[in-house]
Swiss-Prot record:
CDD domains: KOW_Spt5_1, KOW_Spt5_2, KOW_Spt5_3, KOW_Spt5_4, KOW_Spt5_5, NGN_Euk. GO terms for cellular component: DSIF complex; rDNA heterochromatin. Residues 869-897 have a biased composition (Gly residues). Residues 552-585 form the KOW domain. Its main location: nucleus. This is Transcription elongation factor SPT5. Residues 839-852, 914-961 have a biased composition (Low complexity). Keywords: mRNA processing, Nucleus, Transcription. It is found in: Nucleus. Component of the SPT4-SPT5 complex. Interacts with RNA polymerase II. Residues 79-89 have a biased composition (Polar residues). The lineage of its organism: Eukaryota, Fungi, Dikarya, Ascomycota, Saccharomycotina. The SPT4-SPT5 complex mediates both activation and inhibition of transcription elongation, and plays a role in pre-mRNA processing. This complex seems to be important for the stability of the RNA polymerase II elongation machinery on the chromatin template but not for the inherent ability of this machinery to translocate down the gene. Belongs to the SPT5 family.
Length: 967
């Protein structure tokens, strides 16, 4: 027993002795009396109180010594202190000896209860000694159990702490020798403080501890990213790979096995994750790079180990991908593959069911097999053929797709039919049939997931029972197919149109606003109008279409071009990020659509495609036997038709009987003046108060559907009777095309191809060109000798549709000959521009009658062998030896021997000096030009006589008489 414990025990005994002085005897021993249990309990309580008060007294002294030690003062016990300790120890020993003597003397007198109390005190004293002896080796400041904490109050805790500190200091002083120093005690105290703080940290609440660590180890600096932090985006340059990143290797493999190898490497890494993990980080492949897979690893040896035992791959043929090519290689591209999930439509690529539509029912665990639902093709053995060996010959014709029939299978091929799991499940020839459909497993490579495009008749085969419950909504599918076709065609290319206001959604240029300039398949060129960086304003940027979003304002009138609300129009009432809420014009309800599915609509019915484009605006349709009309407005599920009676009717597409397609020849009428009117002619109402005018759109019997640019209602279309209008201009009239200045004549560089020939053209005031729908022959140019039909014509040119080539050409009218009853008549002659018989000169100014004058003078070059109506040896137009209109021999114009216009041998131009020389001379003998000798006598082209000089030859030339007024 230590001296400290002896001190406490002795003092406690002394207190007990003094409290019971009356019980002492002369021999110095206590007088023990018989007491009941209550007295014994009271004495024990008093003992405990005395012990507690003694401990408090000593705790005060130990507290003072502890404060001195914490201030760094190391006190060594003095001689007086040591003597005090020794004396207290001796006193304790003496007291113990006295107690033992008293106990021996009074053993017989003490009852069993007192012995038990003493035993309990000794046991508790031993326990206390053992617990205090370990104070130097355990953390005396550790917290006790929760039960003890509940029992102890704050005062008891402080008292216990001070007592234990006092005991520890006392023990330290007791065990101290000369070698101990103040530094060692200070170091021991610091260790205990560190352990105490660590224990407190471990006992803290998890949330408090996490907040403490966050505040302790948080970053004290941030990386500057400019304005991108405020906008919520990160610059792509900060995400660029570097040489510190793991390397990527391109491994060559068998083409077509890329995805299979990636899947196998993934399974291998997952299998060896615990026993012998692979050190590869990533495995991927790109559809655009056939025959390669890519593995990311820190060491090449890890790739060799991962590829050990793999087939269809060439492990030695690997390439290190440069770091600068990482972004292009790792760029996220939308895969063209369709994710295979139950319920999607696919097509089979091999076997009896090649190109048949199927529905995915389930997938295998390895992902390589697909269980599909098909409409079976069975003939139940009715068309089976067998060879000599009894083997079945496969039929070359495929049976039509029909649902499985149990009756036919039992009737024709019952030996191969077995019952399956379920009331309508069967196994026929090793294949499973349920509810009439075939359920069969196919390899993944035998499944086509792209460009499936199911047809309505194929989908109808999968429809069973109630369409609302088990079947398919064919109407919805048809609408989706229509929308799909529209989006794949014009829809995709027209999602963004030049002039649209757009905003960049993501990337480095996010929040940039611009205007679309041009579009391509996947890229849009915009002109920046608003940007956070002023240097980009008014600059052109090329942005992927997926990164753009259309911008609209509240109040814009828009039209939906894609989705289930396609072709609906409405008014924008709210913009919510990428979505727009609009009020539909048709249903008067709010509709939410994606902003890129909208375009601005100028008219509610413009460009509306109803019933797949069967009808369009301004079409002439027939509603019933007696009612026809023109479509003036088209909505999603109805049309507005202006009838021939002038009534506006709203009809469904099913209410339209047919579309009237009348030829131009059938659409002809006469106006109130009796003039012919046709489609395209401009007419004006002469009866009524409105006096409307416009171009004829359709003609049906006596009703004219006219389109006016001055009327806004019904797309500018109105209807009237043909007898109420008069023709202003016709479609092919020159007047209608020459109301403005003729720019061709104002330009000196543009001249008519043949001014002389066109001088005889007469300006038409009304009616169509005579060449329209005539068969013509091309006389000159690259198409010389080809025939065709004139489809259009103006004052100079004609457009011809060739017979031999399905081609239209444009040629001048003067180079054409009109075919009339097999005879080719030149154009100028066809239009009646010639001045008289035998004269093809269109103007009628040179030769013959000039300016409506009588033909008294021979032609300009007549006489001799001249062709322009001259006589000579060859009579012209029935003439004899004389020239045009000359006398003598056989006259050509006037015939016989009778001279023309009383002229005998004299001149035809009023003269009487026949036989004289021409050109006013009288001494010209016989000239060759028109002489009596055959072919000019002895002179040609004047012989010895030249143009008025008569030396030799016959008579004068130029009409056998005096010409131009000579005698």
């Amino acid at each position: 027993m230590s001296e400290e414990e002896n001190r406490i025990t002795t003092s406690s005994d002394d207190v007990i002795k003094h409290e019971h002085p009356d019980n002492s005897t002369a021999g110095g021993a206590y007088e023990v009396q018989d007491r009941d249990q209550n007295d014994i309990d009271e004495e024990e309580e008093e003992k405990e109180e005395n012990k507690r008060s003694a401990e408090e007294e000593y705790s005060i002294g130990s507290k003072r010594s502890l404060e001195d030690s914490e201030e760094g003062e190391s006190k060594v016990p003095t001689e007086n202190d040591q003597a005090l300790i020794n004396n207290s120890g001796e006193g304790a020993e003496q007291q113990d000896n006295g107690d033992e003597a008293n106990d021996d003397e009074n053993d017989d007198e003490n009852d069993e209860d007192e012995d038990e109390d003493e035993d309990e005190e000794e046991v508790s004293s031993n326990k206390r000694k053992r617990r205090r002896g370990a104070n130097q080796f355990i953390d005396i400041e550790a917290e006790v159990d929760d039960e003890e904490e509940d029992e102890m109050d704050e005062d008891d805790e402080e008292a216990e702490l001070l007592r234990e500190q006092f005991i520890a200091d006392d023990s330290r002083v007791e065990t101290m020798d000369g070698k101990d120093s103040a530094g060692e005690h200070q170091d021991d105290r610091l260790h205990r403080q560190f352990d105490r703080r660590r224990q407190e940290a471990e006992d803290q609440d998890a949330e408090v501890l996490a907040e403490t660590l966050k505040q302790r180890y948080r970053k004290t600096h941030t990386v500057y990213r400019g304005d991108t932090t405020a906008s919520g985006t990160v610059s792509q340059k900060l995400l660029m790979p570097s040489i510190n990143d793991p390397a990527i290797y391109a491994i060559r493999c068998t083409p077509g096995r890329e995805k299979d190898l990636v899947r196998k490497l993934y399974e291998k890494k997952r299998t060896l994750a615990r026993s012998n993990p692979l050190e590869i980080l990533t495995v991927f492949q790109r559809d655009s790079f056939k025959g390669y897979i890519y593995i990311e690893a820190k060491k090449p040896e890890a790739i060799e180990r991962a590829l050990t035992g793999m087939v269809n791959i060439y492990a030695k043929q690997r390439l290190l991908v440069p770091v600068r090519e990482y972004p292009d290689l790792l760029k996220q591209v939308k895969s063209s593959d369709v994710e295979i999930v139950p319920g999607i439509y696919v097509r089979i690529t091999r076997g009896k069911y090649k190109n048949d539509l199927a529905i995915v029912d389930n997938l295998s665990e390895n992902g390589l097999d697909v269980r599909c639902k098909l409409v079976p093709r069975l003939d139940y053995g009715k068309n089976d053929d067998f060879d000599k060996d009894g083997k079945r010959i496969r039929s070359k014709t495929k049976p039509i797709p029909r649902l499985f029939s149990e009756q036919e299978a039992r009737m024709y091929d019952g030996e191969y039919l077995q019952s399956g799991r379920g009331p309508r499940a069967f196994i026929y020839r090793g294949e499973e049939y349920n509810e009439g459909f075939l359920f069969k497993d196919f390899k993944l490579q035998f499944i086509q997931t792209k460009d499936v495009h199911p047809k309505l008749e194929e989908l109808d085969r999968f429809q069973t029972g109630d369409p609302e419950e088990d079947g398919l909504d064919l109407a919805a599918i048809a609408a989706s197919l229509k929308n799909k076709n529209n989006s794949e065609g014009a829809g995709r290319s027209s999602a963004f149109q030049p002039g649209d206001k757009v905003e960049i959604r993501r990337g480095e240029q996010a929040k940039t606003i611009g205007k679309v300039l041009s579009t391509s398949l996947n890229e849009i060129t915009i002109l920046v109008t608003d940007s956070g960086d002023p240097k980009f304003v008014n600059q052109r940027l090329t942005v992927p279409a997926n990164d753009l979003r259309k911008l609209f304002s509240a109040g814009d009138h828009v039209r939906v071009i894609e989705g289930k609300h396609s072709d609906e129009t409405g008014l924008v009432i709210k913009i919510d990020n990428d979505s727009v809420i609009l009020l539909s014009d048709q249903t008067k309800q709010d509709v939410r659509v994606f902003a890129n599915y909208l375009i601005k609509a100028t008219d509610a019915s413009s460009n509306t495609d109803v019933t797949g484009g069967k009808y369009d605006l301004n079409d002439l349709v027939q509603l019933n036997v007696s009612t026809v009309g023109v479509i003036v407005k088209a909505e999603k599920s109805s049309f507005e038709v202006l009838t021939s009676e002038g009534r506006l009717m709203s009809v469904n597409p099913a209410g339209i009987a047919s579309k009237l397609e009348l030829s131009r020849r059938e659409q002809i009428a006469t106006d109130r003046n009796g003039s012919t009117v046709k489609i395209g002619d401009t007419v004006k109402e002469v009866l009524g108060d409105k006096k409307r005018e416009g171009a004829i759109l359709h003609i049906y019997k006596n009703s004219l559907f006219i389109k006016s640019n001055e009327i806004l209602e019904n797309l500018g279309v109105f209807v009237t009777n043909c007898m109420n209008v008069s023709t202003i201009t016709t479609k092919d009239s020159i007047v209608s095309k020459s109301l403005g200045p003729d720019l061709n004549r104002m330009n000196p560089n543009l001249k008519l191809p043949n001014p002389i020939a066109n001088a005889g053209l007469k300006t038409r005031v009304g009616g169509r060109d005579k060449l329209i729908y005539k068969d013509v022959l091309v006389n000159s140019g690259n198409y010389k000798g080809l025939m065709g039909k004139v489809t259009e014509a103006d004052e100079v040119y004609a457009r011809i549709e060739l017979h031999t080539k399905s081609k239209k050409i444009k040629v001048t009218k003067n180079s054409l000959s009109v075919l009339v009853r097999g005879e080719a008549i030149p154009y100028l002659r066809f239009i009646g521009a010639s001045s008289g018989p035998g004269n093809s000169n269109p103007s009628g100014n040179f030769g013959g009658a000039s300016f409506n004058q009588p033909a008294k003078t021979p032609a300009f070059s007549s006489g001799g062998k001249s062709s322009w109506g001259s006589g000579g040896a060859t009579p012209s137009v029935g003439g004899g030896a004389t020239a045009w209109g000359s006398g003598g021999a056989q006259s050509s114009w006037g015939g016989g021997k009778t001279p023309a216009y009383n002229s005998g041998n004299a001149s035809t131009w009023g003269g009487n000096a026949g036989g004289a020389s021409a050109w006013g001379n009288n001494n010209g003998n016989a000239s060759t030009w028109g002489s009596n000798s055959k072919n000019g006598g002895s002179s040609t082209w004047g012989g010895n006589s030249t143009w008025g000089n008569s030396n030799k030859g016959g008579k004068s030339s130029w009409g056998n008489g005096s010409a131009w007024g000579g005698k």
